[in-house]
C-alpha cells in the first residue's frame, strides 16, 4: 500500500531535507495553505482538502474536497481521516508543526489518533522527527545529536533506554513530571528505546543547519 503524505501550512525552511523523506509512489494530500509549499517541495497533489480560509481555492483538475469553515475537525485531521477511509496505513506529516501552538499540539496528537487506529506515522519539521514509542523497540541512529522522550498520554511505565548518555531501566515518566529531555546517542552506537506500558513521544533532533 502507498504511504500518505499530509502537507500542512506551517513554515518549512528545510525543503531539501523534507524532500529526502518522499518516496516515488507517495500519495500527497495538501491541506489548505499547505499548497504554498507545493512548488518548493516539487510534489503534485493527489488530493487537496480545506475550507480555504487561509489560501485561495486553486483552479485545478486535481481532486479537491472543499470543507465548511464551521466544523469540528481541522483540515489536517480531516485529511488524516479521509486517508484512513481510503485504506492508507502509513503516514508522513510535514508542515504541521510550528507557528500557532494550538494547531501544533493538535497535530502532534494526530500521531496518537493514527496509532489508536493501528497506523504508522512520522512527523517531520525543520528541527526534528517525531513518532510514538510503545512496546516495540525503536532505534535512534547516531546521526541525531539529541533525542527526547515526552509523555503526552498519561503515565508510561517500563521505559528502557540503552546506547545513550543517560540510560534508563524500567523507568516511569508522567505527564506532570517530564525528565526525558535531551538525551544523547553514545558515539559509534545506536540508542534503543522501548516502553512496556503507555506511549511516549520520541523527538529526534536534526543537527543544526
Give, region by region, the residue ranges found by the protein language model.
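N-terminal beta-strand-loop-alpha-helix module at the start
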Residues: 1-58
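Short phosphate-binding loop-to-helix
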Residues: 64-86
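Short glycine-rich or small-residue beta-strand-to-loop segments that form or flank ligand, phosphate
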Residues: 65, 91-96
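Long, charged alpha-helical interface segments
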Residues: 128, 133-209
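Short Gly/Thr/Asp-enriched flexible loops that form oxyanion-binding sites at enzyme active sites
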Residues: 101-112
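Short, acidic/small-residue loops that bind anionic groups at enzyme active sites
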Residues: 113-130
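A glycine-rich helix N-cap at a beta->alpha junction
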Residues: 63-69, 119-122, 147-148
Amino acid at each position: 500500500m502507498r504511504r500518505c503524505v499530509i502537507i500542512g501550512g506551517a513554515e518549512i525552511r528545510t525543503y531539501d531535507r523534507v524532500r529526502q523523506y518522499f518516496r516515488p509512489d507517495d500519495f500527497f494530500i495538501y491541506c489548505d495553505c499547505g499548497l504554498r509549499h507545493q512548488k518548493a517541495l516539487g510534489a503534485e497533489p493527489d488530493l487537496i482538502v480545506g475550507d480555504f480560509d487561509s489560501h485561495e481555492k486553486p483552479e485545478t483538475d486535481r481532486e479537491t474536497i472543499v470543507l465548511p469553515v464551521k466544523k469540528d475537525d481541522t483540515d489536517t485531521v480531516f485529511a488524516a481521516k479521509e486517508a484512513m477511509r481510503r485504506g492508507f496505513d502509513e503516514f508522513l506529516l510535514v508542515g504541521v508543526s510550528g507557528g500557532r501552538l494550538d494547531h501544533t499540539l493538535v497535530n502532534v496528537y494526530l500521531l496518537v489518533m493514527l496509532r489508536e487506529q493501528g497506523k504508522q506515522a512520522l512527523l517531520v519539521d525543520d528541527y526534528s522527527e517525531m513518532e510514538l514509542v510503545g512496546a516495540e523497540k525503536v532505534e535512534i541512529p547516531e546521526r541525531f545529536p539529541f533525542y527526547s522522550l515526552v509523555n503526552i498520554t498519561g503515565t508510561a511505565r517500563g521505559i528502557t533506554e540503552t546506547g545513550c548518555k543517560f540510560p534508563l531501566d524500567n523507568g516511569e515518566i508522567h505527564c506532570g513530571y517530564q525528565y526525558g529531555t535531551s538525551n544523547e546517542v553514545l558515539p559509534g552506537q545506536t540508542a534503543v528505546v522501548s516502553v512496556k506500558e503507555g506511549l511516549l513521544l520520541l523527538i529526534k533532533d536534526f543537527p543544526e543547519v
